[in-house]
Amino acid sequence: MGFFSSLGQINVWSLLRPIIESDLEVIVIALGGYVLAKKGFLPRDAQKVISSLNVYFFTPCLVFEKVGNGLNLKMLIDLSLLPVFYVIISAASILISFLLAKLFRLTPRQRNFATACITFQNSNSLPLALVSSLATTVKDLLWDKIPDDTPDKVASRGIMYLLIFSQLGQALRWSYGYRILLSPNQPEDPLPIGNRSWSHSDVNEEEIQNLLASSANVDGVQNSVQANEGSTVQTDSSAISKNDNVQVETSNEEVGGFGAASSKISKFIVLLLDFFSPPLYSLFIALFIAVVPPLQRFFFEEGSFVEGSITSGIRMAGQVAVPMILVVLGASLATDISKTEPTQEVRKNNDTRVIIVCLLGRMVVVPLALLPAFSLLSYFSEISTVDDPVFVVVIFLLVGSPTAIQLTQICQLNGVFERECAKVLWWSYAVFTPPNSLLLAFASLLVVKWTK
């Protein structure tokens, strides 16, 4: 009865309103991109240019302003447990995506895409709006360990939790997601046997042309060698022996000194730097500024010259990032729907399976697997953060949140799964998010009441 009396405190419309507002905000901007693409203003090449601009400039500006101004050293120390929760949630999501991919017989590339959709959730707009709404309407979210706790303090703590999770998600999304899961360098999936005749003949013709071109180049090189040296055989043999000597000398030098070790270290550094992305660089710089109070005051102190000029410019550029992502999302929907391919029917069937796995994993299986375990932890644990009622709400909304909109930006930039990503996001936000978010909000309040 206690739970139902606490539910009586909630105005259902006040909970539904931020959900509907967040969804309509996404749909309206994406619809603008859809119409522009249909009218021919945003062809595929233009979409890729916009995505590149966003990744290399606007998104780093957004990350810098949010992290540098929103975090500080004390906050990071107090909330040091949150990365552990994020690792557990991400690892469980990856495991679930692999199991679903095996069950639905997805190819390795499709499995990687599904893993990205299931692992990377929206931790900004939608959960933020819901937490802010619940904080002002539900008295049970007041924490008895904080004297004189108020709805404003509850909302501040909820936003702080979401901000930490959001930046952890940014780091994983722009490293593991950008460079591995959605990398453009993955091998292509084989077509079914019934459709191989078309692609096989096309590939053979291209291979023959490449071989003929390379053969002509080799002939040209041999003729020039004969003209200059007079004997192709002698030149080749002398070149071979010379190369052998050089290789032996080089290998001896590397074995004898530190050449091999330094070469491996330099290669590792190059690979590590290549693994990072512009938003990730921006995140590290912003974190450094956030944990050094003089630097944070220098950039973000209100009324200062730097805050009113440089920081204000960065903030203005960052505000463009999310609308541009949504415009490209709508444009990619329009472009992909009108796109025709020889293997369209086969790809359509495969797309349906991938989209089902993404939606099922992100919106259903992951919450069902993780939230009961977290509810038990919240009931029995003595950890202070876990005991915070608004933290329980944040975890519920985060675990069941739809796929991150930013994923379409990565797919567009790398040229992979653009159509599938657009469809996953459309179904997530337009169909499943309103009832799913409402159910998660009520379930989290039930757990809060149970643990008190």
Curated annotation (Swiss-Prot):
Location of this chain's protein in the cell: Membrane
Residues forming coiled coils: none
Pfam families: Mem_trans
Membrane topology: Multi-pass membrane protein
Cellular component terms per the entry's GO annotation: endoplasmic reticulum; membrane
TM stretches of this protein: 18-38, 81-101, 269-289, 317-337, 354-374, 390-410, 428-448
Alphabetically ordered keywords of this record: Membrane, Transmembrane, Transmembrane helix, Transport
Molecular-function GO term, any one: transmembrane transporter activity
InterPro entries: Mem_transp_PIN-like
Domain of life: Eukaryota
Similarity comment: Belongs to the auxin efflux carrier (TC 2.A.69) family.
Protein name: Uncharacterized transporter C5D6.04
Biological source species: Schizosaccharomyces pombe (strain 972 / ATCC 24843) (Fission yeast)
